[in-house]
Structure formats: C-alpha cells, structure tokens
C-alpha cells in the first residue's frame, strides 16, 4: 500500500483535489499533515477526496507549521464539522522521540470512536507503546517512516 505523505501546502492540496479520481482508482491512501492555519484549501481538497470516496489519513499532531503547538482547531474547525459524516478517513498520530505514553493514551481515550493510524518515526519505547495499544481496537494502521528516505 502506498501512502504519499503531504504537508498540506497549497500546491499539494491542489494536487489532491485535481487527482482524487486517480488516487481512488490506484488505491492510494494519502497522509496529510496540515501546516497552514487557513483550512479552506484543505477543506476543498477533502471535499474532492470524499466525492471520490478516497480514504486518507489526517495528522492531528503535526510536527511542522501553524498547528505544531495547538492542533485543537483541527478538531473544532475540521474534524468535528467538515469530516463528521465521512467515514473513509483516519486520524493520524505521529509517534516519535517527542511523544509520551501519557499523551498517546490520552489521545486514544479522547478518540475511542474514531479510526486511528499511527505514524511511527523513531519512537524509542516500542514495547511500552504496544502494551498501551493492545486495549484499543480502533487503531487500524501502523505506518513506519524510513529514516533513510528523509535525507
């Protein structure tokens, strides 16, 4: 399964919007990391994806951009509104060296009714994470970022 990782910049969102049918036909599942406070372009891209029934993963704890320190607007202005009736998406949660088990558990508890995908990017406590995740059947995917591909 191919998961193109997009930072949610204007050109990337236009690409998603204009190629939603192609993504659907190819079975690709894009991962979108929102970086801009203005969610209107992202909403347009999501509208195109939903028309073609394209599944996607929306990162809710971005490591870059305007939502890096406050992702609450992603929930209040997008997930709980625009996406509330669309079932073909997962909340994506990045687990890396900055992540804590307490934050991960809190996120899972807060989103027990939603589909979750974990984006693994060098999280150092894999065994402890596995113990936390075993209690949650809403975790649908684990995607691992290859450190070599980031250079």
Identify the residue ranges that each predicted region occupies.
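Internal, hydrophobic cores of structured domains that mediate oligomerization or house catalytic pockets
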Residues: 75-151
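N-terminal basic/disordered segments at the start of proteins
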Residues: 1-26, 36
């Amino acid at each position: 399964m191919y998961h193109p990782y997009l930072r949610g910049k204007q050109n990337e969102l236009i690409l998603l919007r204009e190629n939603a049918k192609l993504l659907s036909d190819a079975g690709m599942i894009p991962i979108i990391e929102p970086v801009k406070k203005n969610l209107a372009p992202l909403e347009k891209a999501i509208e195109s994806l939903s028309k073609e029934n394209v599944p996607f993963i929306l990162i809710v704890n971005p490591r870059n951009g305007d939502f890096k320190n406050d992702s609450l607007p992603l929930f209040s202005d997008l997930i709980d509104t625009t996406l509330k009736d669309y079932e073909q998406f997962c909340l994506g949660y990045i687990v890396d060296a900055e992540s804590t088990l307490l934050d991960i558990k809190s996120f899972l508890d807060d989103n027990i009714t939603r589909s979750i995908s974990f984006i693994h990017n060098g999280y150092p406590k894999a065994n402890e994470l596995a113990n936390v995740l075993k209690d949650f059947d809403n975790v649908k995917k684990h995607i691992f970022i290859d450190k070599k591909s980031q250079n």
